[in-house]
Amino acid sequence: MGAETVTAILDTTLGVVFTWLGWKTAKIIRKYTPYSYPNARINAMEAKLLTGQRFNELAESRTLQNFIVNLEDTDYKVHLSGVTEDPLEIERAFERALASTYLLMEEILPKRVSGFFRLLLEEWDVRNIASVVKAKVRGEPAIDYVVEIGTMVPKVKAIAEAKTMEEILVILEGTPYEEHYQRLLLGEIDVDQFETELYKVYYSRLLEYATSRKEEERLILEEFVRTKIDIRNIVTLLRAKRAGLPGEVIKRHLIPGGSVKLDTALNVDDLGMALAELDSTKYGKVLRDEREKIEKDLTLVEPVLQNHLLRRMEELTRFYPLSVATPLSYILKKEREIKKLRAMAKLIADGFEPEKIKEIIGEELA
């Protein structure tokens, strides 16, 4: 083989290598660079989350007026501005703060994932529609149940003000919820099953979005959604077992798409046996660690599982620092913070002593 031939082969090989390196570098830049600014901003926001010490200070407020004043140096100031010492007004101010967080994520994140955070807002659509329709069925003032958050607030208000149940069907026309409301009107399902069907629509849309992404974005979003479904299903299962409901009734209220099978747990006799069946799932350890408390107070199940999801998102954030795991982790922390603030406002309004508030906030909602 002549020198010219060897040189030509080397040139060709080097050309292929450099082309591949250029393509690979461009792919990495295209994949990760869009997360640099938003994730840096989110990390700065995370540093401003309230500490345990700050919650202890807030617990000393004693009045809702002091509670609001003590939050004036936080990002909640803009949402609490003009709010009276009404626990419901304060609760809704915190809900607006959470909604603004979702909208900010949609605004600053890469377009290939930003739509997911818009979809997350649709959970308030489901909550609003279900709450308002339930109020209508019970003959209660439906407007009292409207929370002005979500993507369908005008429609929700129109539903609340509707004169007849049939009028609501017209308002929901063209939405993903029209079909299920029609089934409710026809008597094919009751109002509780109607709510479940709305959540099935919501989670199916989230899961469809997650599975349409690529590589780690799909991995992270899909695990997030499937875990959220698992949490809802486990909470539903355990509450139903405590109430003594049969498996076939419980099954109708479970959301498809979760990562764990609950068929065996559906057919056991009581809450303790249901928890024992869950022991073999990936949630077994976290539930086992808190089992004694959970059996006494089922409201602890959801925060225990939510904390598990948060820890998992934090793990993925460390493994994929420039990814959608960072905003998801932050959202979960923000939700937990707002849940604590809402609970604290109610406890202060109910006249609980500071030490008792610290105990409740620190233990039950940690």
From Swiss-Prot:
InterPro entries the record matches:
ATPase_csu/dsu_sf, ATPase_V0-cplx_csu, ATPase_V0-cplx_csu/dsu, V-ATPase_V0D/AC39_subunit, V-type_ATPase_csu/dsu_dom_3
Look up and give the membrane topology term.
Peripheral membrane protein
Compartments, as annotated in UniProt: Cell membrane
Q: Which domain of life is it from?
A: Archaea
Q: What does this protein do?
A: Component of the A-type ATP synthase that produces ATP from ADP in the presence of a proton gradient across the membrane.
Q: Which NCBIfam families match?
A: AhaC, PRK01198.1-5
Q: How does it assemble?
A: Has multiple subunits with at least A(3), B(3), C, D, E, F, H, I and proteolipid K(x).
- Name of the featured protein: A-type ATP synthase subunit C
What is the organism of origin for this protein? Thermococcus gammatolerans (strain DSM 15229 / JCM 11827 / EJ3)
Point out the gene that encodes the protein.
atpC
